[in-house]
């Protein structure tokens, strides 16, 4: 199960956060800080999977943005790595070559048009086709 999805820039600003488990606001900020600290300084030669508390974080960097997904320790890492890539492809299609500014100024479209909820529902991957 997906615990949360974060899109952060290199400076640690969270551009998009979607939590599938209830957390207090203070805990959310702490999680965002810890995840950023884990992924930003990691050597590119290492894998894109890292243990985080009792879960694991799968991340991928696209330009200046880090797309991170926290999942259960037993979940398939490669499936969620492809999930990140699918999300980026959908954003590229929706925004015509997405960049960080698209997410800053059009974040309501990502939520209002339910781009993320079209293929992830209640923390589970539902749809893997970008055509549907």
From Swiss-Prot:
Signal peptide location: none
Domain of life: Eukaryota
Tissue specificity as recorded in UniProt: Widely expressed in the embryo, endosperm, leaf and root.
Subcellular location: Cell membrane; Membrane, Coated pit
Protein name (record): AP-2 complex subunit sigma
Function statement: Component of the adaptor complexes which link clathrin to receptors in coated vesicles. Clathrin-associated protein complexes are believed to interact with the cytoplasmic tails of membrane proteins, leading to their selection and concentration. AP2S1/AP17 is a subunit of the plasma membrane adaptor. The complex binds polyphosphoinositides.
GO cellular component entries: AP-2 adaptor complex; intracellular membrane-bounded organelle
Gene Ontology molecular function terms on file: clathrin adaptor activity
Topology of the protein relative to the lipid bilayer: Peripheral membrane protein
Record keyword GTP-binding present: no
GO biological process, one term: protein transport
Keywords: Cell membrane, Coated pit, Endocytosis, Membrane, Protein transport, Transport
Native species: Zea mays (Maize)
Assembly with partners or alone: Adaptor protein complex 2 (AP-2) is a heterotetramer composed of two large adaptins (alpha-type and beta-type subunits), a medium adaptin (mu-type subunit AP50) and a small adaptin (sigma-type subunit AP17).
Similarity comment: Belongs to the adaptor complexes small subunit family.
One Pfam family from the record: Clat_adaptor_s
């Amino acid at each position: 199960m997906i615990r949360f999805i974060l899109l952060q820039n290199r400076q640690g600003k969270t551009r998009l956060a979607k939590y599938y488990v209830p957390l207090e606001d203070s805990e959310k900020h702490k999680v965002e800080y810890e995840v950023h600290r884990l992924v930003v300084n990691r050597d590119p030669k290492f894998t894109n999977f890292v243990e985080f508390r009792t879960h694991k974080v799968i991340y991928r960097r696209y330009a200046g943005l880090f797309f991170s997904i926290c999942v259960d320790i037993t979940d398939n890492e490669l499936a969620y790595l492809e999930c990140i890539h699918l999300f980026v492809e959908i954003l590229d299609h929706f925004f015509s070559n997405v960049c960080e500014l698209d997410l800053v100024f059009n974040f309501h479209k990502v939520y209002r048009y339910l781009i993320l909820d079209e293929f992830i529902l209640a923390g589970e991957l539902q749809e893997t086709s970008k055509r549907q």
